[in-house]
Structure formats: C-alpha cells, structure tokens
Amino acid sequence: MTRTGPPINPISWDTKTIVPDDGSRIDSVACQDARPKGRIRRSMTACHTCRKLKTRCDVDPRGHSCRRCLSLRLDCELPETTERFQDNASTWSDATAVPSIEERLVSLERGMGEMIHLMRQIVKSSPSMPCSPTFQTRNHSIDGTSSSDSMSSSFYPLKPAQLIRDLQAECFGERAHFSDADILGDIVTQGIVDSKLSVKLIELFVEHFGHWVSINHSSSLQRSNTLLFNTACLLASRYMPGLPQHTVRDISLYVQHAVAKVLWKPPPMTSDMLQALTLLCLYSTSIHKEGLMDDWLLSGISINHALISFNFLNTLPGDNLSPDELLAQLRLWNTLCATQLHSALANGRTVNIQQQYINQCPRILEHAGATPEDGRIVAEIQLYRIALRLQHSQSRLQFAESEYEELERWRMEWAHLLTTNGDSTLNLNLWFCQLLLHRTAARLQPDSERLLPEICGTARLIITQFLQTRFTSAPALIDHVYFIVGYAALTLCDYTLTDPLINQVRGFLLHLAPGGDNLSYRIACIVGEVQRRYSEATAVVAAGSHSSSPVAEVKGAQMFGSSHHHRTGMELSQLMSSPEGLDSLVEGYNCLEQMMPGYAASQPAFEAPDLFHHSPTTGVTGGAMPIGLVPRALHDW
C-alpha cells in the first residue's frame, strides 16, 4: 500500500539552530549555501557510539565530538567526510604552531620562576626594604622597629640591641646624640681665623673642591655645620702660602679631633658630616702634616655610616627623596666607593663594600643632573674592581701578557671618556692599574725583563700626561693622583735612572706646590731623595764592576734600610742634580696668584730653592698671599 500523504522531512542538523561560542544564535537557513545540499543519511554522519546505540548523534561537522560522547566523557569516533577532512586539514595546519606556543609558555614559566627566586634572595639579603611616607615618623614598638631605618612594614628584622639602647635613654634620660657644639666649635668662634678670612677660604673651597660634594655656592656652607665648615677651610688653607703655619696646624688638629668624635656618633649621620668625611677621604694625606689619616680605614667607616644614613640604598627609585637629594647622595656614595677602591688597590688591602651596594653606583648615570665627572667616577669604580680581581689572581699574573682582556673591554666601554685632555685623570688611573699589574706580574714571573718595556712605557705615559695639567686645575687633584705620579717617577728611578722625565716631573711638582707642606712638594722631595740614593749606589757599583746595567744591580742593594734616618729638614739642593727639570715645563706656571687674579702679594711667599732659578736675578716663587686674606696678626686691615 502506497502512502499518499505529504512527505515528512526528517529533522537533521542542517535544520537546527546552532549556538556558537559567543552566545548568539545563528539560523541555519542563512547558512545553507555553505552546507551540503540533499539528504544525508544519519548513519553516515553519526559517530561509532551513537550508531551502536542507534540514537541521534548531534554533532557539528566542524567539531571533534558529539554531545553524547562529551557528556559521557567517551572518545568520539566520527566518520571522515569531505567537509570534515578539509576542515581537519586546516586545523592540522594551524596545529603546527602549537609546539612553538608551548615552548614559549614553558620559557615564560621558567623566567617567572627565576624572577621569583631572585626576588626572594633580594628580600632575604637586603638589610632594609622600601618604606612608605606614612612610616617617616619615628614609631617604636616592642621589637625595636622604627622608620628611621627605612624599613617596610612587610619585613622588620628584630633589633634587640637597638631596643635596649633606646629604652636605656628613655629610662635614664641619657642623650642619644651629640650636637655639633658638643663635638667642636667652628674655627671662627675658636678665634683661629676671623670671619673675613673664613669667607675667602670658603670661596676658594667652592671653586676648587665643592663639586665633589655637590656644593656650588658659598651660601650652602653654614658655620653651624662645624665639621664641614672647618674641613672646607682646611682644604682651602693649603693653597694660601701666606697663611701662618701654626694657623693651618690648629685647623688641622681641630678637624682631626672632631672626626675622631664624629665617627663614633650613633647613626644616622647628617648629610653635612658625610660630606666632610668624603672630603677627608679624598685628601687624607695632603691636609694633615701632623698625624696622617688612613684613607682606607676612614672611607670604610664612612661607608658604614652612609649605608645607614642614605635612603636610596634602602628604597626603590621614586621614593620620598627629591631629585636633588637623590643626586647628592648618589654622588657622595660613588665618591666614597671610589676612595675605598683606590686605597684598597694602592695599599694592597681588601674592599669593605658588598657587591650589591657597589652595583648601586651606575644609578647616577640615569639622573638628569648627572655630569661627565659623575660618569668618570663610575668608570673608575668599574676599572678598579677589575684591577683588584686581577691583582688577586696569581694564575693570571704568572702568565700575564702585555694586555688584559678585561681592561680592553673596559677601555672600549668607556672610550668616550678617555681623552687626552690634561684635566682628565681617567687615563692616569688606567695606566696606574696597568703599571701596578705589570710590576706585580714581573715579581711572579721568572723572565721579569720581558715586561720591562711595558713597565717603563706606562710610567712615561703617566708622567707625560701629568705634565699637561693646567695650573688652575691642580688644586682640585685628589691625593691619589699625586700618588700615581709619584709611583710612576719612582718606577723610572728603578729601571731608567737617567730618564729626563724624572727631573721634569720633579720640578713640575715643586712648581705646583704653594708651600713646603703641600703634598706635591713632599712627593718631589721623595723622588729627589730616591734618585740621589740610586745615583750614589750606582756610582759605587759602577766603580767596583763593569756591569752593563748598574741600575739593575743597585735594585738588589739595601736602599732604604734602617741606616737611613729621618731628616726633619731636607735641602733640595742636595736632591736636585741639575736645573734642567724646569726647562721643559709648560708655560704659565708662575705663581699662585693665577688662582685669584687681582690680588697683590703682601707677604713673602714660599720660594723654590736657588737651583730652580732660571737666572741669578729671576726667581720662581710658589705663590703669594692675597692682600685681602692676610690675618690680622700679620697685616693691619
């Protein structure tokens, strides 16, 4: 029997609406041109599970599983159709990027893990953490925590000793801090100099030394900051030849006594005191004739005070410090680090700064107010770190060549600061490090003569560039520069005693000295004394033998034994063998009046020995005291 009713259209997936991932409903009628036309048997499109169960298999042909298998969590085995095959082909083409994506995810996870590990190490090793402005007021607790140490509320180490000291001061009424008046008054109040002279001294200090501690105006120096004020006057007094020696001596003793008390003050230390200590580290030898300060010890203790006092070491950039305060602290910190590294290498000692704090030095280069001088200090710090590592590597020095790879990389990195300008001392420091490494290697290598050309050549480079120093730049040169030049001259005395550069640099140092107590004068005397002793010993050796190199035999003799007693007065006429030392000096080095033009001499100045007179009637003086700076005791204003 044949059915005559209207045909029943089977319901299949092409008449159903599909809910896409974005939640909107799409009518299948609008997409029929993209669907296969005609009737498709359900068994051809159903999965293996639905065919076995003889149930409807509701699946999107672009999907990979039907709804039943998804709900039952079964593996859906769909038959391959032409459309699905084409779709799978495009899917597999896209799947080729999956491994690279997975590799990137694994790399990102590994990087995040390393960052988390480093952050944990920083938190554990850092003495302090960032502090918010709300913790700037002093707030004590039973654990002894306070905002003065720049601690974060999330990490406070226990400080029982600090707690006991604070409670002791509270219970017994003891003062925890000394004022400047408790330590020492200023030299004007003490009557050592009068106010007019102190004004001139401060002006001279600002002009030649203030840049080291970010002091650009005399108004920045107040008498209330006694240690800084006295130190500034002491530095300037070195270049006033007419100033009585007892006055300079009294200022020096006052500063030394104040430093001895300041160093034992409870931290934190004020900014002006750290500025004074930094200046004393730079000029520890030249400003004190009575009782020299050890720059290595002084810089080490000052660095410990700075670690507690400087906020930028304990906080992240952009904290409560103003840009000018941050720049001043960064500049002081870098200068202290440089003096510590200078003294460690020059004295054969260790460095008392942790690596993480030295790594803070380049931060100053990111500041908008950084100067080329700041960059030079950072370059010196990196240079001396390299030299110290090489100096303590015996294996490297035993087989050392004329060049070191680390120093060459440093030279390439800082080539823009290495100039032949006489005012720049960066080249002097590089050659000094090379000279020290070459001489150390020569002691360890059996064939020491192999490095002799490098040693003498480097010493000549140092002296040659130093002879180009302008007279107006000489006062600002730190003690370490004079040590470099003196060591280069002594090196030439060791190997080439007749080198004319020895006499030239000796005369040049004497010409720079405004007085007999100046460091350049003393180094010139030392070089002259060593040259004299070598000359005498060489003459004795040459008379007793016919050696081709008398100086080489003299080096093995006892040149500086106990038989040579200290002489309080040293006559330069005995030290200088000929006046040719001044013949090749750079023109323009006549007297100290060039530093302060417009002043006339009113006192007898320091005079060089007769040996340095270019003619019997013309003398070369070391300077003159400006009439406006003569103390009352010497001149009636």
From Swiss-Prot:
Main localization of the protein described in the UniProt heading: nucleus
Renumbered residue ranges of the record's region Disordered: 127-153
Entry's Gene Ontology cellular component terms: nucleus
PROSITE patterns in alphabetical order: ZN2_CY6_FUNGAL_1, ZN2_CY6_FUNGAL_2
One Pfam assignment: Zn_clus
Compartments where found: Nucleus
InterPro entries with a match to the protein in the record: prtT, Zn2-C6_fun-type_DNA-bd_sf, Zn2Cys6_DnaBD
Protein's name in the database: Transcriptional activator of proteases prtT
Organism of derivation: Penicillium rubens (strain ATCC 28089 / DSM 1075 / NRRL 1951 / Wisconsin 54-1255) (Penicillium chrysogenum)
